[in-house]
Amino acid sequence: MTARVVIVGNGMAGARLAAELHAREGDRKVTVLGAEPHRAYNRIMLSTLLTGRIAEPDVELTEAAGHGIDLRPGVPVTAVDRSAREVRTGDGERISYDHLVLATGARAVVPPLPGLDPTDLPQRVVPFRTLDDCRRILAVADGARSAIVLGGGLLGLEAARGLATRGLATTVVHHTGHLMERQLDPAAGAVLAGTLAGLGVTIQLAVPATGVVADDTGVRLDLADGRSLHADLLVLSCGVRPDTALATAAGLTVRRGVVVDDRLRTSDRNISAIGDCAEHDGALTGLVAPAWAQARVLADVLTGTDPLARYRPRPVVTRLKAAGIDLAAMGDAAGGGPGEELTFADPARGTYARLRIRDERLVGAILLGDNPAIGTVIQLFDRGHPVPADRRALLLGRALGGAGAAPSASPALMPDAAVVCQCNTVTKGALVRCWRSGARTLDAVVAGTRAGTGCGGCRDAVGGIVDWLSEAESVEVTR
Amino acid sequence: MTLREDDTGVSVLPRQFPTNRGGLCQKGWTSAELLDHPDRLTTPLLRDPVSGELRPATWDAALDRIATSLRAIQSSSGRDAVAVFGGGGLTNEKAYALGKFARVALRTRNIDYNGRFCMSSAAAAGLRAFGVDRGLPFPLADLGRADTLLLVGANPAETMPPLVRWLTEQRRGGGQLIVVDPRVTATARQADLHLQPLPGTDLAVANALLHIALTEGWVDQAYVAERTSGFDAVRRSVAAWWPARAEQLSGVPVADLEATARALGTGGRVIILTARGAEQHAKGVDTVTAYVNLALALGLPGREGSGYGCLTGQGNGQGGREHGQKADQLPGYRRIDDPAAREHVAGVWGVPADDLPGPGVPAYQLLDSLGTPDGPRALLVFGSNPVVSAPRAARIEGRLRDLDLLVVADLLLSETAALADVVLPTAQWAEEDGTMTNLEGRVLRRRALRPPPPGVRTDLAILADLAARLGDAETAAARFPTDPATVFAELRRASAGGVADYAGIDWARIDDADGVFWPCPSADGPDTPRLFADRFGTPDGRARFHAVDHRPAAEEVCATYPLHFTTGRVLAQYQSGTQTRRVAALRRAAPEAFVELHPDLAARLGIDDGDPVRVTSRRGELRAPARLSSGIRPDTVFAPFHWSGAGRANSVTNDAVDPISGMPEFKICAVRVEKA
């Protein structure tokens, strides 16, 4: 088994791998080198941190510690020496490995705009990616009244929602004609824009930015249509780029990300890569679920727990859920082609649903607003299970035909065999017979049949039948 | 309930009592039918060595046969070669006497009981969090006043109907009822909000609820700081359970998780209750712990009107787990590996502490070792029917057949008794005095209406008879009294100073006060309806958080076994059905086993309502008619566990057990379903 594993990166992927290794049997030394000086944290919660409702300790994750895990935050790796099987750290230390894992993640893209130098951004211009970014945003936001978010993708909207929750007048500037165009169709994008507007976020669509001017007092964002927007803070959310610098310098095969096979191995069999920095089968991950799946597979392979484990990408679900926003997008909902399409739109209430079904399986869905079946839809898509025979269940949830038969409006319409009291298995017929044999009050019928003496939930129904019997002249009952 | 006996027999009358308030379900109303049931055993049965059949025998012959065999087995294979299996339906006195009999008369470490199958995970979770395991640490009446009540894996509308009166009162008072259950049960139908997770994902749901409570600022930070320890580790572990992650795993929409967390986090009086649905998993202790963590983070336990509790299952589910029929336990909820506990109990029993055996193994492990080279060769069963109730039941049936001696004490010829070498007819509920302890920790009286029929003996008398044959008759008579009041007096002394302290309880006090809540250390001091007001039962008085994470079920679905299988109860039957299947009205109400499945699934499998279906797992199969219901998830099928033979659900269930409690994973395994 691998004796010394070095993980470069203590982010969502690297920290998870350390935990997965920790949970498996075997004797090994695992060193985690994190460039950031923090404990492992949950990047997904950073937008909530922006709202001010939680504090930094609330985003910390469980760290594997002890039992052969050496966790070293704040130690950047500067080089990999593949022939010596060593990594070099920022302060010149050399650390040997039997197996090296690159979990270096991705960096925020700073768009090539006049006024933005990626190596020296103005104080009021901050990308939204790391905990340190978050601290900088919060430092500026404290006392600020307005913010612009450049980029209307998932992260940009989360940042905008977080800043708006803090009370900042927030504007999202997006270069294409609708929000989250990679996940949504134009109609859904429009409904989402309406929802965000209701939450106090202004949306500027189809306007590329052309330049940034920032000083100590504020930021000006110039737009292609000639307008300029002013704010106290500019947050950049223009995508991320895999951090492949170490891999490239070490001569590993790198395309957009560090190229890995199904075992997460790079072109060097002693080096693996997982998470945002890795490119598997031509695809980058960019989300937590695949990164954690990769960590699990790699831990299985490295520890020999399951040497045959292989990473198989699963379709991803994009989820945006915050106060007032409920969005799920998965697969190809708008692609057309063979199959069925289900749609529902109630733009006034911010609800939109579009689902595509092929061969009884969901191949894509966009759900926005109040969609009670959202959990079912996500699970059916994720697991590839067949869809309900009655498709409406996908739109309306279990409200449809779900919970048992509703009580009949009139006792006259109830079949005699209908069980009124479940606890004591008393049928309508039994109640009628009891009444006919002389019981004329609710208490007498209860005493005679035991109906209503268990959970008591049917007392009203029994009372209704007694009332009906008192009023009806002649009631037929089958034996 | 109150009983009346006249020329026509015994009849049952409901009684206004603080817990059921006059409510009885059909099983209560019809319970007297068993007293004079024609199937009632009234003579011991001995297996004829030639014909292999059970034949009536005298008590002396039966007891001599047992004693001779036990002595021979213990002298050749050691004391632990004899095992004892008890039940959560036994009175406190009988459970106590059974534990003492095992440790003192047999001196075997091998004793456990069927409560391991139904309450042990909540017990373990409660102990490690609070230092005390009492089902409800507050009176049941608190449920009726809760603003928010969360029921996790509990279906009282079918398993405990009179309790539903409290739920009705709660909702009439404007309270919100939230139910977590993979099926739309009779209880879920009454809920304001029903979360319907995939079986085996309740732990993730709890962690997501706590995640939301943290991000929304609903955690009671002052309470966490003053009354608990270990929260930081939990906070970090639930940080990884953002709601969308739990949604994808469980199928519970984030919006529903948020609504639930809000109701729990912002309600005034908030109660969280778990039951078998949360417990009967290979991660049952951790699942219950996740809900305990949630309750602690919200500051519920110990706050009047709020709290966490476990709905206990069997008739004496609480008392049965307190006085020594558990493998690792001595009376008073003491640990058998605690030297001080051993000294105290050995003193009461009049034996040297060193003579007491050490801890045995949990129920399933015990049953699974029977008749194996290193396992017990003899088993005495009191008040249990593992042939129907154990997981992977066909295997356990085989183990029982491998024994050199199987003795079953029962009032009816249960499926387990039918395999026995010796069957001893015992008295039943209306024929014995004693006490039971209900889910509130309230000790109650059971009063004998009439003596047992001729030929029938009480469990206490059987233990005394056996002890006399196994050792010195005079000592045995002193150690194993047959009068329940005498046994209770000794139980009081044995429990004194323990967690479940009964020292101050006597039968008259129980009668006067409608039951007495333990701990009650002194006859002139108060009892304890509410626990944890000032401190928890841990050494430092603080409740303990434990970080717990979701893990997959022991057996997940695959291409060959693509469906989840889960088990449970129906209203008109009880446990292994030995008693309720013999009551005509109950048989009419619930005549046979069934397999509940969703109409979409049924359509894909070509199954119509009522068709015979076969459910197959890696361990066995179940055959029963299909019952179509849109109240179950299409990826899950359900069967009740009350029946034997082809309809035995436990032929299919998984025998994976929780690493801490030893509770089997009855609630989830992988199956395939086809038309039979």
Regions picked out by a protein language model, each given a short descriptive name:
Chain A
Residues 1-70, 160-183:
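Beta1-alpha1 glycine-rich phosphate/pyrophosphate-binding loop at the start
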Residues 1-2, 6, 62-148, 222-224, ...:
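FAD-binding core/adjacent interface of flavoenzyme oxidoreductases
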Residues 2-4, 277-375, 402-425, 429-430, ...:
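Mid-to-C-terminal Rossmann-like scaffold of FAD/NAD(P)H-dependent oxidoreductases
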Residues 9-12, 129, 150-153:
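Glycine-rich Rossmann-fold phosphate-binding loop(s) that bind the pyrophosphate
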Residues 27-31, 71-89, 95, 165-260, ...:
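A Rossmann-like FAD-binding core segment of flavoenzymes
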Residues 120-144, 214-222, 227-293, 297, ...:
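FAD-site-proximal beta/loop scaffold in flavoenzymes
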Residues 371-389:
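A short, polar/charged loop-to-alpha-helix boundary motif
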Residues 417-431, 447-466:
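Local cysteine-cluster metal-coordination motifs and their immediate loop/turn environment
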